[in-house]
Curated annotation (Swiss-Prot):
Designated name of the protein: Protoheme IX farnesyltransferase
Species whose genome carries this gene: Opitutus terrae (strain DSM 11246 / JCM 15787 / PB90-1)
Residue runs in coiled coils: none
E.C. number(s) listed in UniProt: 2.5.1.141
Transmembrane regions listed in the UniProt entry: 43-63, 92-112, 114-134, 140-160, 166-186, 231-251, 272-292
Keyword annotations of the record: Cell inner membrane, Cell membrane, Heme biosynthesis, Membrane, Transferase, Transmembrane, Transmembrane helix
CDD domains, alphabetized: PT_UbiA_Cox10 (cd13957)
Listed GO biological process terms: heme O biosynthetic process
Length: 295
């Protein structure tokens, strides 16, 4: 652990605390929900949505690191985070996180839509009050976290339409099922780190990796089926349907290769990168379809 005084924290240290790259995923999926709802063009509302979701995601990231700074200090992957590295004081991280979360809720409620604020509140509480503590005691922590991570499209959809219709809930399902193989691949790769801090997640408990791989495959298959529902329900054209089918089958193939014991470690990395490629491709196709192709 670094001995750098937290009182010397720089702006870059606080920015790192908000995990801007990871927070961008929440912002982008909220934008997908907003654009897929096809509301009347309102650049001010769109900018406020981005600002509100950015603040919420950054605040949650800061508070999560405040809650987990003890375990972060004992894992190689997280030991360099601002709090365990001594760059930011725990009290400062707490204050920053609380202010960002409260500010985001106020902004979204007053200037965007109350339902968007409600889904943001659900995101904050499900992540910090359910997922973060569950990592210490539950094998199902990944799935609990996937619930929290699937709310941003609903934030965007409710901001655009004032309610959530069928396609919005499909987006929730897509984000949920996508996260399971994504984080299973990460957790399998870093299972020794998680074992060192006694997180009882499936990749720690399943030494062979057979159940990890099977569970990843099941959720990837569920993702493929869920992603095709908009086409089956007449909510998109074949442009999106083909994109969802091709990318979904490619993702599924990587999950199948993860089932092979001899190459499981290498396959986990490939599954991770496949998940990174899958999401922007399928969500980008959905936005293009909804904005320009659906009558």
């Amino acid at each position: 652990m670094s001995t750098t005084p937290a009182s010397n924290a720089k702006f870059s240290d606080y920015l790192e605390l908000t995990k801007p790259r990871l927070s961008m995923l929440s912002v982008m999926t909220a934008l997908v929900g907003y654009l897929a709802a096809r509301p009347p063009w309102d650049p001010i509302q769109l900018a406020l949505l981005v600002l509100g979701t950015s603040a919420a995601a950054g605040g949650v990231a800061a508070l999560n690191q405040w809650l987990e700074h003890d375990t972060d200090a004992h894992m190689k992957r997280t030991a360099d985070r601002p709090i365990p590295a001594g760059k930011v004081a725990t009290g400062s991280a707490f204050v920053l996180g609380v202010l960002m979360c409260i500010g985001s809720l106020f902004l979204l409620y007053a200037l965007v839509h109350p339902l968007a604020a409600l889904f943001t509140l659900l995101t904050i509480f499900s992540y910090l009050g359910w997922y973060t503590p569950a990592k210490r005691w539950s094998r199902w922590s990944t799935e609990i976290g996937a619930v929290a991570g699937a709310f941003p499209p609903l934030i965007g959809w409710s901001a655009g339409e004032g309610r959530v219709t069928a396609l919005g809930w499909v987006l929730f399902g897509v984000l949920f099922f996508w996260q399971v193989p994504h984080f299973m691949a990460v957790a399998w790769t870093y299972r020794k780190d998680y074992s060192a801090v006694h997180f009882p997640m499936l990749p720690v408990r399943d030494e062979s990796g057979e159940r990890v791989a099977l569970w990843s495959l099941i959720n990837t298959a569920a993702l493929l089926v869920t992603s095709l529902l908009p086409l089956l329900w007449g909510l998109t054209t074949w442009f999106y349907g083909v994109a969802a089918a091709v990318t979904g089958l490619w993702f599924l193939w990587q999950a199948i290769k993860f089932m092979q014991p001899a190459t499981r470690d290498r396959a986990a990395r490939k599954l991770f990168f496949a998940s990174i490629g899958y999401l922007p491709l399928v969500l980008g196709a959905l936005v293009i379809d909804r904005l320009f192709l659906v009558s």
